[in-house]
Amino acid sequence: MRRADGQPVTVLVVDDEPVLAEMVSMALRYEGWNITTAGDGSSAIAAARRQRPDVVVLDVMLPDMSGLDVLHKLRSENPGLPVLLLTAKDAVEDRIAGLTAGGDDYVTKPFSIEEVVLRLRALLRRTGVTTVDSGAQLVVGDLVLDEDSHEVMRAGEPVSLTSTEFELLRFMMHNSKRVLSKAQILDRVWSYDFGGRSNIVELYISYLRKKIDNGREPMIHTLRGAGYVLKPAR
């Protein structure tokens, strides 16, 4: 899903829980969107002025000010800015307060990442920010992945991948130069927590290396104790 002008959607994620903010950000990057994060209200307002996001994911409970105060400020400067509110509060009056303050939609913690993505997609369509879903070519160095045709090329040569290998590579390319832990890969590619007992990630990383690197300068690297990273060959 892209903006009406063909550019990637820019999302501002505002949450004072770093792990949660990173989890949401990673899922949205997987959608091909550009992500900016802020951990408090003041930073959020500054980031919105600097980045001009297309949509905001805003936690109601922030350390320096209420998320609703942030919402009022954002709306005073950009009345049409779509905002999805996140909160641990589940009382009806809290939901009403958030929507009355100008929030376009509301998700209560704990939530599924899939729900956040779907609500953002619907919100972007409803507010006219985006038009139609559009696949994209992901490019990292001489590695190219086409999300529409599922074709993969390395140095101009086709690479044949299984569906799971393709999803793993796509996830790594959306997060190129970022270290991805085994748990993050399991959650995104397999949507299942094996409790650290499975070697399925190691197995599929090995499969990808044989097909992607295959005698060339390596792009897939292991950081012992941390995870895996895909980056352009030197």
Curated annotation (Swiss-Prot):
User: Per UniProt, what is one GO molecular function of this protein?
Assistant: phosphorelay response regulator activity
Question: Mind listing the UniProt keywords for this protein, alphabetically?
Answer: Cytoplasm, DNA-binding, Phosphoprotein, Transcription, Transcription regulation, Two-component regulatory system
Q: Where in the cell is it found?
A: Cytoplasm
User: DNA-binding region at which residues?
Assistant: 135-232
Which CDD domains does its entry note? REC_OmpR_MtPhoP-like, trans_reg_C
Q: Which residues carry this modification: 4-aspartylphosphate?
A: D59
Post-translational events: Phosphorylated by TcrY.
Which PROSITE patterns does this chain map to? Answer: OMPR_PHOB, RESPONSE_REGULATORY
Q: What are the record's GO terms for cellular component?
A: cytosol; protein-DNA complex
Cystine pairs: none
Q: Which is an annotated Pfam family here?
A: Trans_reg_C
Q: Which residues form the Response regulatory domain?
A: 10-124
Q: What is its main location?
A: cytoplasm
Out of the domains of life, which is the source? Bacteria
Which biological process terms from the Gene Ontology are attached to this UniProt entry?
cellular response to iron ion starvation; phosphorelay signal transduction system; regulation of DNA-templated transcription
The knockout note for this entry states: Cells lacking TcrX and TcrY show an increase in virulence in mouse model of infection, with significantly shorter survival times.
What the protein does comes down to:
Member of the two-component regulatory system TcrY/TcrX.
Identification of the protein by name: Probable transcriptional regulatory protein TcrX
Native organism taxonomy:
Bacteria, Bacillati, Actinomycetota, Actinomycetes, Mycobacteriales
Q: What gene name is given for the protein in this entry?
A: tcrX
